């Protein structure tokens, strides 16, 4: 068990350039919501702050991480433990307003880690962003 109610957690995921960053920023502007801000890491993504699972870059980076079997963490992952769940929260808490009703963590790999995150934080919510494929064409792969 962690020191935060998992029902307060909202995870946003989606492939790079699918709109996760602007969506999470707009969501974080709601008075009852806090997103990770002023973290000093790329796009204020929680994946770069936490010490538990490998970052998307280690699995090929933008878009490519989704094809790496090792990046697909599920409810059977050996990384699941109360200590790891708390370690992830401890890494994110300094960048949230803990008085907010809902706490948003946005990282593209969340799109393939929902089952893992749900096991770590039962009752948490997930939002998946997607975009038309042609909008992404040529950006990361040219």
Regions picked out by a protein language model, each given a short descriptive name:
Residues 19, 42, 135-136:
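Flexible, glycine-rich phosphate/dinucleotide-binding loops
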Residues 29-115, 119-120:
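PAPS-dependent sulfation machinery
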Residues 12-13, 37, 104-106, 128-130:
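Short beta-strand segments
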Residues 4-32:
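Walker A (P-loop) phosphate-binding motif
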Residues 106-109, 117-141:
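Conserved phosphate-donor/acceptor-positioning beta-strand/loop module used by diverse small-molecule
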Residues 10, 100-102, 125:
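Short active-site oxyanion
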Residues 13, 75-78, 126:
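Short, flexible active-site loop motifs that bind/organize anionic cofactors or intermediates
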């Amino acid at each position: 068990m962690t020191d935060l109610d998992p029902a307060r957690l909202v995870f946003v995921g989606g492939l790079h350039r699918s709109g996760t960053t602007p969506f999470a920023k707009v969501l974080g502007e709601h008075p009852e919501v806090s997103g990770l801000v002023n973290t000093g890491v790329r796009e204020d993504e929680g994946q770069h702050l936490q010490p538990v699972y490998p970052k998307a870059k280690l699995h090929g980076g933008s878009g490519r991480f989704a094809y790496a079997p090792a990046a697909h963490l599920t409810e059977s992952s050996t990384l699941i433990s109360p200590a790891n769940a708390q370690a992830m929260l401890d890494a994110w808490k300094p960048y949230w307003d803990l008085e907010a009703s809902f706490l948003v963590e946005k990282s593209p790999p969340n799109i393939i880690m929902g089952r893992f995150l749900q096991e770590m934080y039962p009752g948490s919510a997930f939002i998946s962003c997607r975009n038309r494929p042609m909008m992404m064409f040529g950006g990361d792969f040219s």
